[in-house]
C-alpha cells in the first residue's frame, strides 16, 4: 500500500483541492485490488491482450472518480485525455464500447472479490481511526434504472433491465411554523442499503436490492452480514440509528 505523508486522513479540503487525475492516482494506489486483478488475468489466460486487465480496471475507477454516468462518456474522456489514458495504463489505444462492456460483465461475475476489497478498506480505516464504527446509522437510497418502467419482456438478451422494479419512499417533517409536510418519491430501479459511520459519514456495510424490498427487512440482513464480515466493529458499536 502506498503511503502519501502530505495527506492526512479525512483532510477533505486537501483532497478537494487536488485535480481529478491526482484523486484518481490516490484511488489507484490505495485500492486493495491485487487479488481481483490476478483472478481476471488468469481467466483471460494467453488470449488477446489489446486492452490490459489492469488498465481496464483503472478506467472503471476513473469513471467513478470523474462521476461519468455512462460508459460512453468515460470512453470519450479517455479518447480526448492522453494523461488519463497514461495513468490508467493504456498504450494510446482506447477500448471499444463492446470491449469495455464485456469487461464490466466479467467484473460483475466476481462480486465476492469486490466485496472483499470493500471489507479490506473498512478494516484499514478501523486500524487508523480507533473510534471508527462507534456511532452507526442505517439508511437506504433510491437508484433509478435507465428504464422508465419495469420491462414486461422477461426474456434475457443482455440489454434489458430485468431485475428493476418499483419503489417508494415517504419523507415527513415539520416546518418552522409547526405544520407537517410529507414528500413521496417513487421510482423504478433499485435500492442501495447502507450501514455507515455516522461521525465520518463513511460506509461500513452495503447491499443492493430491488426497489420494492422494505428497508426493515434488509436492515436485519445487513446486520447479519456485518456480524459475519465486520464482527469487531459491530461488537464495539455504541449507537445504531435509522429512520
Language-model-detected regions and their locations in the chain:
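Short, Lys/Arg-enriched N-terminal segment that forms or immediately precedes the first helix
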Residues: 34-48
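Short, flexible active-site loop motifs that bind/organize anionic cofactors or intermediates
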Residues: 46, 64, 90, 133, ...
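Short, positively charged, Gly/Tyr-enriched micro-motifs
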Residues: 49-116
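Charged, often Cys/His-bearing segments associated with DNA-binding zinc-finger transcription factors
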Residues: 1-38
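Exposed alpha-helical structural elements
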Residues: 22-26, 35-36, 83, 99, ...
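Glycine- and acidic
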Residues: 41-43, 60, 205-207
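Polybasic low-complexity intrinsically disordered regions
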Residues: 102-242
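Structural motif
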Residues: 45-54, 182-185
Amino acid at each position: 500500500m502506498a503511503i502519501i505523508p502530505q495527506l492526512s486522513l479525512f483532510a477533505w479540503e486537501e483532497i478537494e483541492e487536488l485535480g481529478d487525475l491526482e484523486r484518481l492516482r490516490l484511488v489507484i494506489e490505495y485500492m486493495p485490488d491485487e487479488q481481483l486483478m490476478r483472478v481476471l488475468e488468469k481467466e483471460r489466460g494467453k488470449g488477446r491482450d489489446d486492452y490490459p486487465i489492469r488498465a481496464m480496471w483503472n478506467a472503471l475507477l476513473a469513471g467513478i472518480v470523474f462521476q461519468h454516468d455512462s460508459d460512453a462518456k468515460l470512453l470519450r474522456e479517455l479518447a480526448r485525455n492522453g494523461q488519463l489514458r497514461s495513468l490508467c495504463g493504456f498504450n494510446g489505444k482506447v477500448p471499444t464500447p463492446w470491449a469495455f462492456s464485456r469487461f464490466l460483465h466479467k467484473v460483475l461475475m466476481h462480486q465476492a472479490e469486490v466485496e472483499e476489497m470493500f471489507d479490506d478498506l473498512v478494516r484499514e480505516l478501523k486500524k487508523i481511526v480507533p473510534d471508527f464504527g462507534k456511532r452507526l446509522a442505517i439508511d437506504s437510497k433510491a437508484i433509478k434504472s435507465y428504464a422508465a418502467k419495469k420491462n414486461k419482456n422477461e426474456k434475457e438478451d443482455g440489454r434489458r433491465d430485468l431485475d428493476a422494479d418499483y419503489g417508494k419512499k415517504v419523507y415527513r417533517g415539520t416546518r418552522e411554523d409547526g405544520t407537517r409536510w410529507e414528500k413521496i418519491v417513487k421510482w423504478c430501479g433499485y435500492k442501495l442499503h447502507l450501514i455507515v459511520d455516522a461521525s465520518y459519514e463513511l460506509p461500513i456495510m452495503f447491499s443492493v436490492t430491488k426497489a420494492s424490498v422494505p428497508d426493515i427487512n434488509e436492515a436485519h440482513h445487513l446486520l447479519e452480514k456485518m456480524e459475519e464480515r465486520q464482527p469487531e466493529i459491530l461488537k464495539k458499536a455504541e449507537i445504531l440509528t435509522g429512520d
